[in-house]
């Protein structure tokens, strides 16, 4: 009986000593956890500048007294341009699960950016304007365009946006003097007035926020845009004389379209973001 009591006492003593020794051991340091990176918010206004390359095309035919007198002819041009832009964006989370009410979309809440902007492009986008039915040819230049519109996009990452845009646009084409297209050429005496065309545009692109620059708020934006002008055709007067005979009632009915790719460096003020 005494042996059993001594054995129990020894076990209790060993347990107490073991606990005391364990308490004296150094505790492992807590694992280091880096502070979370701040989440950028795209809400705010911005300015940007850059440039790109553009193409324009047109389908046109000559009229006399409003009646077509030549078949439709296709012409076009291409060239470089500079661009400036201002705009404002607003970022929010789109809870698709609650909006659509479908379990398939449960938990899917992408970050969405919507905004409005205006831009101006100027350059030398030169091309040809020929009227084969009248034996005339000339050089035509798109000198400037401007646009106002809206855009909507999804943040693939907190600093990478893909977007679509669209809106209203105007294009300015300079006037031109026609030459005879046959051998020997020479001035024809006819000219086409400068004209501003109204139209619409759609586009798509992406924008990326630089993370390695010391200045926060710098972005790189690339966009592809298609614009169409003239609706069912704009009638532009032909003026002058041929062989000393004044030309009256003649015009060129024209529809135009442009395509361009541009890249801009953007600075975002982020007044309302974080």
Q: Locations of the language-model features?
A:
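Gram-negative outer-membrane beta-barrel domains
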Residues: 2-274
């Amino acid at each position: 009986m005494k042996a059993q009591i001594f054995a129990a006492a020894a076990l209790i003593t060993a347990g107490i000593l073991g606990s005391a020794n364990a308490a004296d051991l150094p505790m492992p340091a807590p694992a280091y956890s880096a502070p979370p990176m701040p989440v950028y918010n795209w809400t705010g206004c911005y300015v940007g500048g850059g440039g790109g390359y553009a193409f324009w095309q047109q389908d046109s035919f000559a009229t006399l007294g409003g009646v077509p007198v030549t078949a439709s002819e296709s012409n076009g041009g291409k060239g470089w341009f500079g661009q400036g832009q201002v705009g404002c964006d607003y970022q929010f989370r789109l809870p698709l699960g609650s909006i659509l009410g479908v379990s398939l979309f449960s938990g899917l809440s992408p970050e969405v950016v919507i905004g409005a902007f205006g831009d101006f492009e100027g350059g030398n986008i030169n091309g040809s304007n020929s009227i084969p039915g009248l034996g005339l040819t000339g050089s035509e230049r798109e000198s400037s365009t401007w646009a106002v519109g809206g855009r909507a996009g999804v943040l693939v990452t907190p600093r990478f946006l893909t977007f679509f845009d669209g809106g209203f646009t105007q294009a300015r084409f300079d006037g031109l003097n026609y030459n005879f297209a046959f051998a020997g050429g020479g001035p024809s005496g006819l000219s086409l007035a400068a004209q501003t065309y109204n139209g619409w545009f759609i586009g798509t692109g992406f924008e990326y926020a630089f993370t390695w620059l010391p200045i926060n708020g710098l972005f790189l934006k690339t966009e592809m845009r298609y614009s169409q002008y003239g609706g069912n055709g704009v009638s532009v007067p032909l003026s002058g004389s041929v062989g000393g005979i004044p030309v009256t009632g003649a015009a060129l009915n024209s529809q135009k379209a442009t395509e361009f790719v541009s890249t801009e460096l953007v600075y975002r003020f982020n007044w309302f973001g974080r």
